[in-house]
Amino acid sequence: FTVSTIHESGYEVVELHDQGSGTRVQLYSFGALLNAFTIPTKTGTINGIDGFTSINDAVANATAGFKSSKLSPFVCRMQHGKYRFNQKEYTINGFYLGEHAIHGLLFNAAFDITYTKSTATEASVIFSHQYKGTDPGYPFPFTLHVKWKLTSGNTLQVFTTATNNHSSAIPFSDGWHPYFTVGETIDSATLSFTTNKQLAFSADLLPTGKTIEDNRFVGGQKMDGIFLDNCFLLDNHSETKHSCTLKNDAVTL
């Protein structure tokens, strides 16, 4: 396994490489995002991530879909960008889609490479960003560490650690917004979840706090003709049970 880094347009592009299988992972320090996960198959290589063409493309189009973005310190939509914490009202000054703030404050942040490791069994990198509380609507400093680890069997893992740098507890949530692809139209792919609980959204895609029974994906559902812009409440993850699987005849993610 190897780790290599090049500089591009003021950022770092990191590649994790399994020399045995040929699997490659491309990561940007811009947003600590996963831009490519290239996997050898019987019919050639497939990139399982719908990424950007370059760093410049990512910088220019980060909010046009938030492809592979890290979502911190809040995920999805926040109604009118407002929330209440410890009896005080705050209004986020981040990115708004329509009337509502969306997908946190670090999706376009510059991360530093703080650790790399390459051995016979893994290639890994840690990106870190120190948020200093600069948004008046979120004056709570924290440090976000994002670790990407490639091991044998085309296994890629992401670990996120947040360190509270404030003097007391802070409001915080974290997520990831990947765009997966199986190398062709999604209509030929099958999607399965370990849940039948879909989160209910309002017309503005804000969570209502309710769930809807949706059994379509428990045993696997072909995506032909299906539109999804929803969240599902997954069962507890375990090392031996995949929470979500997307596959076609060529590749399984």
Where are each of the predicted segments found?
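Beta-strand-rich N-terminal accessory domains
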Residues: 1-92, 246-253
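Extended, loop-rich substrate-binding clefts of extracytoplasmic carbohydrate-active enzymes
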Residues: 2-8, 93-152
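Residues that act as N-cap/strand-start positions at coil-to-secondary-structure junctions
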Residues: 8-10, 21, 31, 77, ...
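Intrinsic-disorder/low-complexity, polar/charged segments enriched in Ser/Thr/Lys/Arg/Asp/Glu/Gln
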Residues: 11-13, 22-24, 122-126, 143-145, ...
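Acidic, contiguous internal or C-terminal segments within carbohydrate-active enzymes
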Residues: 16-18, 28, 129-172, 176-178
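Hydrophobic small-molecule pocket/channel-lining residues, especially in calycin-type beta-barrels
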Residues: 41-46, 55-60, 75, 106, ...
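Glycine-rich, pocket-lining loop/helix-strand segments that form or immediately flank
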Residues: 46-65, 90-110, 192-195, 200-213
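Active-site/ligand-binding surface loops and adjacent short beta/alpha elements
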Residues: 169-170, 179-253
